[in-house]
Amino acid sequence: MASSNTQETERAAAPANADEQQPEKPLLLPEASGIVVFEGEGVTIDASHTDQGYVMIRCEPSEKRLKARIATDAQTYYYDLPGGEQYSVYPLQMGDGLYTVRVMEQVENDLYALRYGAEIQVKLAAETLPFLYPNQYVWYDENTRAVGQADELASGAKSDREIARALYRFVVTHMSYDTDKAATVPNGYLPDADASLASGKGICFDYAELLAVMLRAQGIPAQVVIGNVMPENVYHAWNRVFLEGEWVWMDPTFDRSGHRESDYITDRIY
């Protein structure tokens, strides 16, 4: 996973009639600027921009599997951590407070040992910021085709709600559910927005990630939510989108299936 060295990438100049349209917003990208760094045992944790809702981690290559463990008193998240020189980006989606960030190395099977860790006090500049930047689960940069596609679809829209509606309808109509992939998807699978865009096929995780990429690229906070849908008790991925001061539930996979928001039980948010 590549990371950008620039925090904001400016878009093309707004058209002459921009006063009638939604103003252009910068593309927010993560930066490992080296201002606040924790290092040890071959691990580097860059916490320079925790106020923006993310932390960046890299680790020297290891023959053993590596995990990033990011926790508060409220919840714990585990992520795969590729070894190498490039940073991986992880969200600080649990809000303000003390985070424990650890890199864990596999001992055997599901047993992991601490390789290095740090405690980081987080104060977000805005509570929606973790859902405006790319991270390991919702990855993109200025060269991602889905970002350009979102720009085209958002052209002429007069509000975030209009943009969200256009992007949602695009994902719903462009994507078809891949039952073969659903039956064989490996543990630890991560979506690829451009692969989903190119194939027009995917599982619920692909739908939700593609929509989140396109929305975040337009400066609209978007979550990928993973949990269960009742009454079927189906493990599923969907979205929540921040519009007009509140989080709005969206499910591009099920679309008009008859489910209500109250049917959805959240496990994890990215």
Can you annotate each of these PLM segments?
Residues 73-75, 115-119, 183, 187, ...:
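Generic preference for flexible, low-structure residues
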Residues 55-57, 182, 226-228:
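Intrinsically disordered, low-complexity segments enriched in polar/charged residues with Gly/Pro
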Residues 206-270:
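Hydrophobic/aromatic-rich core segments of domains that either
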Residues 134-199, 210-212, 249, 258, ...:
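Secondary-structure boundary elements
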Residues 1-158:
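N-terminal accessory/pre-domain segments preceding catalytic cores
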